[in-house]
């Protein structure tokens, strides 16, 4: 008994040491941006985005405080097998006051188990809410392949010539399905689930420094028992993606081709909206973008994209965008950036065009001499010029020609220009 009692303090000390080591192993990652800006004509900073475009050129053109705070920890490891718990909470406010309250968005909460299946070495089994293998263009904050949400999957299965990933995720639409509470009275669901099933094959070597990734996504509305979709609802749809990545000049170039149908044409990124009656049709996208650090003096980001959404409802659009962001590095921690971007969006219904030019000059101090170096503090001046001839009706949501020149009856902004200036910080870790 005395021996047991003498061993107890030692056991407690060892356990405390283990718990302390585990506590110190918590990983803290995230992203944040915030700042202050003014508009030349008066008031707080305005931001500029062409009506009908899905994104905007972001340098000197972000008007909110936004943050993602990630906490994660490896909870168990034995040999090459492990379990990792990952979370992410996101916030966004208008950066107008000292005290701004908001409801946080719980973006991620998942477990990733590595090498759990002996006959699939290197694979990861996962379940929960997750940012799943997202593909984006940083300089316009545009996610062109993103099925994130609650889900489960098996990824990075080594086939010898490439890696296979399988996943299922879910998002919901407000309303969208109904049942009958009596013979002639419809009762609508608060939300209708949409499921997406994703297959990807990555790491296909095509040429020196070049790899190919192929993927297919099938999305469908999944109404609850005894509920039905509206007549004409798209119900389901497909999206196919091919992406070639080339390592070049200290960075990369990505060339992407995507084609989507019906329920997958609403977001054009991999999310499904099968309850909609307005998205039957197709989408084709051709995209080229990249980021490079040529040497200690020069870096560059760029994007060029064509996207055509052809809908049976005639509410589609054709969107062209092209932009560059060269960076001159005065010292390893100070640089000047110039971002020039152009958007042109043609309405399928009216055949009218909206276009916008946006130019930003920024002086930046950053933690390193790469285009990706962060944290960064920048001061900027932005000029935007737009000419918009159509918008979405304030009543019907349909595309409508704007003859007022002021956007009085639609989301169109008319013909105008503006200057803004300010300061911003951006960080990821």
Curated annotation (Swiss-Prot):
<keyword id="KW-0813">Transport</keyword>
<keyword id="KW-0762">Sugar transport</keyword>
<dbReference type="InterPro" id="IPR050286">
    <property type="entry name" value="G_neg_Bact_CarbUptk_Porin"/>
</dbReference>
<feature type="site" description="Greasy slide, important in sugar transport">
    <location>
        <position position="66"/>
    </location>
</feature>
<keyword id="KW-0812">Transmembrane</keyword>
<feature type="region of interest" description="Disordered">
    <location>
        <begin position="397"/>
        <end position="416"/>
    </location>
</feature>
<dbReference type="GO" id="GO:0042958">
    <property type="term" value="F:maltodextrin transmembrane transporter activity"/>
</dbReference>
<comment type="subunit">
    <text>Homotrimer formed of three 18-stranded antiparallel beta-barrels, containing three independent channels.</text>
</comment>
<dbReference type="GO" id="GO:0009279">
    <property type="term" value="C:cell outer membrane"/>
</dbReference>
<keyword id="KW-0626">Porin</keyword>
<feature type="signal peptide">
    <location>
        <begin position="1"/>
        <end position="25"/>
    </location>
</feature>
<keyword id="KW-0406">Ion transport</keyword>
<keyword id="KW-1134">Transmembrane beta strand</keyword>
<feature type="site" description="Greasy slide, important in sugar transport">
    <location>
        <position position="372"/>
    </location>
</feature>
<feature type="site" description="Greasy slide, important in sugar transport">
    <location>
        <position position="99"/>
    </location>
</feature>
<feature type="site" description="Important in sugar transport">
    <location>
        <position position="143"/>
    </location>
</feature>
<feature type="site" description="Greasy slide, important in sugar transport">
    <location>
        <position position="31"/>
    </location>
</feature>
<comment type="similarity">
    <text>Belongs to the porin LamB (TC 1.B.3) family.</text>
</comment>
<dbReference type="GO" id="GO:0015481">
    <property type="term" value="F:maltose transporting porin activity"/>
</dbReference>
<feature type="site" description="Greasy slide, important in sugar transport">
    <location>
        <position position="428"/>
    </location>
</feature>
<dbReference type="GO" id="GO:0006811">
    <property type="term" value="P:monoatomic ion transport"/>
</dbReference>
<dbReference type="GO" id="GO:0046930">
    <property type="term" value="C:pore complex"/>
</dbReference>
<dbReference type="InterPro" id="IPR023738">
    <property type="entry name" value="Maltoporin"/>
</dbReference>
<dbReference type="InterPro" id="IPR003192">
    <property type="entry name" value="Porin_LamB"/>
</dbReference>
<dbReference type="Pfam" id="PF02264">
    <property type="entry name" value="LamB"/>
</dbReference>
<feature type="site" description="Greasy slide, important in sugar transport">
    <location>
        <position position="252"/>
    </location>
</feature>
<dbReference type="InterPro" id="IPR036998">
    <property type="entry name" value="Porin_LamB_sf"/>
</dbReference>
<comment type="function">
    <text>Involved in the transport of maltose and maltodextrins.</text>
</comment>
<keyword id="KW-0732">Signal</keyword>
<keyword id="KW-0472">Membrane</keyword>
<keyword id="KW-0998">Cell outer membrane</keyword>
<protein>
    <recommendedName>
        <fullName>Maltoporin 2</fullName>
    </recommendedName>
</protein>
<feature type="compositionally biased region" description="Polar residues">
    <location>
        <begin position="397"/>
        <end position="412"/>
    </location>
</feature>
């Amino acid at each position: 008994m005395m021996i047991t009692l003498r061993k107890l303090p030692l056991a407690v000390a060892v356990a405390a040491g283990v718990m302390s080591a585990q506590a110190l192993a918590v990983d803290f990652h995230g992203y944040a941006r915030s700042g202050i800006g003014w508009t030349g004509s008066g008031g707080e900073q305005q931001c500029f985005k062409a009506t009908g475009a899905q994104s905007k050129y972001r340098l000197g053109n972000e008007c909110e405080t936004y943050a993602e705070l990630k906490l994660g920890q490896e909870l168990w490891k034995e040999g090459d097998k492990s379990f990792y718990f990952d979370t992410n909470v996101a916030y966004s406010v208008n950066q107008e006051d000292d005290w701004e309250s908001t409801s946080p968005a719980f973006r991620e909460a998942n477990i990733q188990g590595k090498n759990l299946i002996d006959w699939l070495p290197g694979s990861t089994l996962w379940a929960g809410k997750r940012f799943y293998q997202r593909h984006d263009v940083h300089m316009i904050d545009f996610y062109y392949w993103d099925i994130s949400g609650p889900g489960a999957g098996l990824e990075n299965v080594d086939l010898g010539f490439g890696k296979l990933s399988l996943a299922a995720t879910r998002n919901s639409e407000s309303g969208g399905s109904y049942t009958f509470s009596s013979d002639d009275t419809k009762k609508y669901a608060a939300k209708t689930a949409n499921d997406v099933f994703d297959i990807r094959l990555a790491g296909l070597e095509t040429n020196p420094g070049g790899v190919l990734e192929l993927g297919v996504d099938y999305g469908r509305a999944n109404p609850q028992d005894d509920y039905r979709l509206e007549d004409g609802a798209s119900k389901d749809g497909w999206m196919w993606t091919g992406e070639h990545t080339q390592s070049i000049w200290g960075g990369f170039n990505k060339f992407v081709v995507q084609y989507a149908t019906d329920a997958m044409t609403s977001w054009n990124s991999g999310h499904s909206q099968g309850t909609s009656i307005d998205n039957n049709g197709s989408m084709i996208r051709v995209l080229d973008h990249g980021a490079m650090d040529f040497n200690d003096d020069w870096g560059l980001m760029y994007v060029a994209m064509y996207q055509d959404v052809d809908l049976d409802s005639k509410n589609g659009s054709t969107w062209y965008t092209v932009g560059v962001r060269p960076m001159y590095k005065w010292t390893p921690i100070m640089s000047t950036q110039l971002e020039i971007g152009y958007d042109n969006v043609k309405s399928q219904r009216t055949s009218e065009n909206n276009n916008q030019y946006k130019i930003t000059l920024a002086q930046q101090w950053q933690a390193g001499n790469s285009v990706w170096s962060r944290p960064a503090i920048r001061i900027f001046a932005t000029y935007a010029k737009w000419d918009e001839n159509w918008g979405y009706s304030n009543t019907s949501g349909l595309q409508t020609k704007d003859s007022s020149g002021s956007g009085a009856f639609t989301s169109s902004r008319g013909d105008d220009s503006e200057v803004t200036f300010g300061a911003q910080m951006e960080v990821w870790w």
